[in-house]
């Protein structure tokens, strides 16, 4: 099912509200390109999240019959990826019968200049050599890393959508989707969104589709969850109960725990949440793929981390086939801590005793080297040296037990 903020996004510039100044600047700029005398090779659209930067770029392509070549610069970070966009634009002709092409580089402020060496330089080269107009978007255009880009582009700022236009849009969506929404709830969504149209629509969809109506109590509960990180139990519930990919991924990325621990929590509770063995199989299949992407991401290709999150959240949530039925209702289950954590907790005292012994041994060597190289042999003949090490009763009991196992 499509997300509402995509379903109801403006297709044409005439449908974009509250951005008259930005629309005029973009129209003058794109027409200067089409007339062969561009007043700037690239535009940097900037504004807070959810104000419609990407939508505005897509509307320009639609209205002027331009083929849109889109790339998320913060995901495709490598220099060769950015150069690939230039090659596609310059080498390949349009297969859609359009007047030309428009290059869109989304979220350029998401580029990490330390990890993504050459990315900014690649964009600068693309701007210098481009045969087609380029639109870039950024939430924070004043990021120091973007200084050279600012100098090479025409900057166009976007406003937050005002309360009245946002109210009209939300009411229109409610009518189209046949969702009952209280006026108080609508006001709360508008105030909480602070001009973030995408957030407002997502909140409306999340509650409206889940409960069939939007009330102030439900909206307040959802808003409170957004303002804080979710504990592991809330995270699991939001993932397993999600009917849409974005709901599950939002839960995963809002979790208090990191991705490694989140995978352990999900793995432990999949058999608890899903009764159907095929659902369990599909969920573990998604989770195993997430583990593969996570391992590769840790190897240095951090672009793959997003795929790991997709699979451990949306992939696991989609495993339950019953969710496709309109009358599906989530099942409340009592989740449990990962057995891995329980085992670590139970063995903590034992491990602490072992570590104290190793510290006494590691006089001229590191702790890890002593643990891996010296300690296994020490277990064999420790009784000859226990007095020299001043071992206490607890440590002697541990060594007696460990040497027998």
Curated annotation (Swiss-Prot):
CDD domains: AAA, HLD_clamp_RFC. The keyword Translocase does not apply. It comes from the Archaea. GO terms for biological process: DNA replication. InterPro entries: AAA+_ATPase, ATPase_AAA_core, P-loop_NTPase, Rep_factor-C_lsu, RFC_lid. Keywords: ATP-binding, DNA replication, Nucleotide-binding. Belongs to the activator 1 small subunits family. RfcL subfamily. HAMAP family: RfcL (MF_01508). Heteromultimer composed of small subunits (RfcS) and large subunits (RfcL). This is Replication factor C large subunit. It comes from Saccharolobus islandicus (strain Y.N.15.51 / Yellowstone #2) (Sulfolobus islandicus).
């Amino acid at each position: 099912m499509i997300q509402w903020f995509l379903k109801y996004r403006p297709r044409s510039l005439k449908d974009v509200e509250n951005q008259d100044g930005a629309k005029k600047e973009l129209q003058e700029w794109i027409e200067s390109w089409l007339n062969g005398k561009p007043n700037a090779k690239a535009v940097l659209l900037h504004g807070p999240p959810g104000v419609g930067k990407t939508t505005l770029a897509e509307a320009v392509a639609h209205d002027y019959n331009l083929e849109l070549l889109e790339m998320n610069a913060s995901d495709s970070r490598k220099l060769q990826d950015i150069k690939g966009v230039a090659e596609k634009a310059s080498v390949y002709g349009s297969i859609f019968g359009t007047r030309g092409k428009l290059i869109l580089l989304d979220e350029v402020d998401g580029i990490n200049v330390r990890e993504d060496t050459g990315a900014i330089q690649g964009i600068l080269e693309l701007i210098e050599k481009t045969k087609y107009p380029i639109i870039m978007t950024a939430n924070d255009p004043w990021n120091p890393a973007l200084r050279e880009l600012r100098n090479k582009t025409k900057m166009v700022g976007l406003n937050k959508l005002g309360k009245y236009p946002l109210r009209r849009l939300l009411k229109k969506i409610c009518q189209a989707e046949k969702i009952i929404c209280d006026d108080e709830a609508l006001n709360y969504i508008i105030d909480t969104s602070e001009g973030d149209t995408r957030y407002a629509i997502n909140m409306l969809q999340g509650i409206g589709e889940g409960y069939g109506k939007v009330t102030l109590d439900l909206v307040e509960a959802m808003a409170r969850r957004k303002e804080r990180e979710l504990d592991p139990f809330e995270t699991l519930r939001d993932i397993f109960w999600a009917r849409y990919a974005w709901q599950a991924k939002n839960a995963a990325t809002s979790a208090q725990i990191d991705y490694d621990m989140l995978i352990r929590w999900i793995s432990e509770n999949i058999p608890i949440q899903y009764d159907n063995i095929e659902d369990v199989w599909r969920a573990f299949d998604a989770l195993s793929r997430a583990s593969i992407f996570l391992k590769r991401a840790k190897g240095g290709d951090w672009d793959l981390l997003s795929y790991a999150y997709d699979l451990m959240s949306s992939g696991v949530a989609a495993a339950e086939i019953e969710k496709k039925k309109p009358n599906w209702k989530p099942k409340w289950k009592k989740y449990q801590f990962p057995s891995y954590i329980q085992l670590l907790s139970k063995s903590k005292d034992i491990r602490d005793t072992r570590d104290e012994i190793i510290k006494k041994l590691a006089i001229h060597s590191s702790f890890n080297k002593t643990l891996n190289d010296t300690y296994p042999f020490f277990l064999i003949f420790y009784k000859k040296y226990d007095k020299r090490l001043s071992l206490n009763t607890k440590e002697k009991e541990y060594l007696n037990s460990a040497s027998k196992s």
